[in-house]
Design a protein with these regions (language model features):
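Conserved glycine-rich cofactor-binding loop
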Residues: 15-16
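Conserved glycine-rich Rossmann-like NAD(P)H-binding loop of the short-chain dehydrogenase/reductase
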Residues: 30-45
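Rossmann-fold cofactor-recognition segment
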Residues: 50-67
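Amphipathic alpha-helical dimer-interface segment in Rossmann-like NAD(P)H-dependent oxidoreductases
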Residues: 74, 78, 113-133
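Catalytic Tyr-X3-Lys loop
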Residues: 100-119
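Catalytic loop of short-chain dehydrogenase/reductase
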Residues: 110, 130-163, 167-168, 172-175
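C-terminal helical subdomain
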Residues: 176-192, 196-253
Length: 256
């Protein structure tokens, strides 16, 4: 049955501000989308937002611990559509405050909340891609806080930097499985309905970020571990997403 159905893209964190842009861009490109989330209300709101899109499906699930991630992966593996790619747009709220004023337990909790869901997802979901004849892409969405410290948001800078290094390690290890794992690093804060009144002109919209993520899935030959996204990507083409067998690539580690 898998051979006659269009492959789908799994979006983690698809109910969040950035994740909604990823979902919108994938649907715009004609791809079936499966969004996993823990909150039934937010999943229902996402369905309402894209009510005219039959390609969107949702699934209740959690990546908060290893056992929950394993159960989720088993359910995804049983779906009739083959899995072509995973886009992880997960991230907690930015906690303002000085790191030197926080306890070690607080920093550990932030690491648990921001990094470990990605680790659980990679461990259990990335292997589902390795035997797939389709795109075999795994994309993590990163923020600019990982490349340089943000004043007043040091905790987020630390956890995001850890995720940035984690993505580079996964990039190397995933190639042995025939999967291309990359981080799409957004170079500025993302303009959302919540912050639009105070947003700077160079901040990309969540839909622009989503379109850039789609470009990494769509026959892209760029195999760098970290690819950057900024407002210069605004003119990306919006054709139908092609999730055919990926081309061979060289191991060219680095960042764009």
């Amino acid at each position: 049955m898998n051979g006659i159905l269009t492959p789908e893209v799994l979006v983690l964190g698809g109910t969040g501000a950035v994740g909604q842009g990823v979902v919108g861009a994938l649907l715009e490109a004609g791809s079936p989308v499966l969004v996993v989330g823990r909150d039934p209300g937010r999943l229902a709101a996402l369905h309402e937002q894209f009510a005219d899109e039959p390609g969107l499906q949702t699934m209740l699930g959690s990546l908060s611990d290893d056992g929950s991630a394993k159960v989720l992966a088993e359910r995804v593996a049983q779906r009739p559509r083959p899995l072509a790619a995973v886009v992880a747009a997960m991230g907690g709220p930015y906690n303002r405050g000085r790191v030197i004023d926080r306890s070690g337990d607080a920093l550990l909790g932030a690491m648990q909340a921001d990094l470990m869901p990605h680790a659980h997802a990679v461990r259990h979901l990335l292997p589902l891609l390795q035997d797939n004849p389709h795109a075999r892409r795994y994309v993590m969405i990163g923020s600019p806080a990982g490349a340089k410290p943000w004043a007043g948001y040091g905790e987020t800078s630390i956890t995001t930097a850890a995720l940035r290094m984690y993505a580079q390690v996964v990039h190397q290890e995933a190639q042995a499985l025939g999967v291309r794992a990359q981080m799409l690093e957004v170079c500025s804060p993302v303009c959302t309905p919540a912050n639009a009144a105070n947003a700077c002109i160079e901040w990309p919209s969540s839909l622009l970020v989503g379109r850039r993520a789609v470009s990494l899935l769509d026959g892209c030959r760029d195999n760098r571990a970290i690819v950057r996204c900024d407002n210069s990507d605004a003119e990306l083409p919006r054709g139908l997403l092609n999730l055919d067998l990926p081309p061979l690539w060289r191991d060219t580690a680095g960042v764009a």
